[in-house]
């Protein structure tokens, strides 16, 4: 006799689905009158365009606005790119260095997945004709290998200087002022693996032993520490990339370069590039330690650092003991659909390296919310707990801003890493097995990402981005440039008009 199946039948599945819909409706009714942050999900509706004429107008509008944003930043890009020393023989050079760099940036703006795809797609006659209409500076498009050979020979760090100049220009123009936290620029830092191989293709690669079916095997990988501006509206602007390198470690003791060592180098570069910029660092649970706090204080940086349960036991002991004596250090609020309860203790002394001391402030947020259980269809209460070390004393009037609008948006950089890995920027693709060229492509990718982010959060394009999603918008623009949609006279008139970037 066979055992009865535990698998749900069709009737049970339909009943569960009906139960979930009822529970979700109940939650929506309970949230009535509460302002909910809009989600990132794109529209599920049919196209609002009624005929070919409307589609043509929409396509030209999207392309022209995207290109106007790019061309608005073009003088800064060209000025800095022109400073890069070109090692090639001028008499034998067909393409200027600036043209090759712009070509590389555009290949990432349009999300070309490889050098081969860039060759195949961007050299099509219609694409070239439209690209020349949009960018008259591009008299002809090079072969991708020409760009690769150039990146092998130049100082590619200068490409990242272009990125920093672009961001510095936006800061000077006060484009980010509405997103600042107590007058400071929130910068999130996080490390991630770029890609790995089973063979040593460059001496700079880090190495590790991984288990295989036939025994242990050496693996060689590239790891990068990224720093980006992380604003509370979700906008994340790339800043600096610090590559970990085998040569930066201690080769005599087989101690490799690590994220904390890379952070010291990144912090020095960040201070060098933005000497007077008021900064609020957002760091994860790897960073709450004396040397990192010392770097922040010496550079006059504020910080919000994730404090995990196992970190800084002496600080946790002080917090648990003092919070009972400070019942006034508490704050409750309803934020979106969550009930939040904050407790904090200021001026905790943290000792490290024998005689060194830092004063830190600890805050713990416990929150609860209701959601539909996907297994039962019932409304259940969920809870979570977050703790941070703060560089400034905590008070009821700054707790929401520092925790919800700053510290929690450290996750922006994790979302950014997910985007560049999975949403078309080919972060994990090795565009060249030359270390210098590989880094050069990485910096070009970050520039392309920045331009797309500015378009995504611009007032003139926000409606179509919300309709199609970010990837859908980029595909929409790329397909338009690939086809016979553009009216040359209208495009030239549109691009000739004055333009000012306005962010939402």
Regions found by a protein language model. Name each.
Residues 2-4, 65, 83-84, 123-125, ...:
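A short, flexible helix-boundary coil/loop motif
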Residues 148-233:
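Active-site-proximal, Lys/Arg-enriched surface segment
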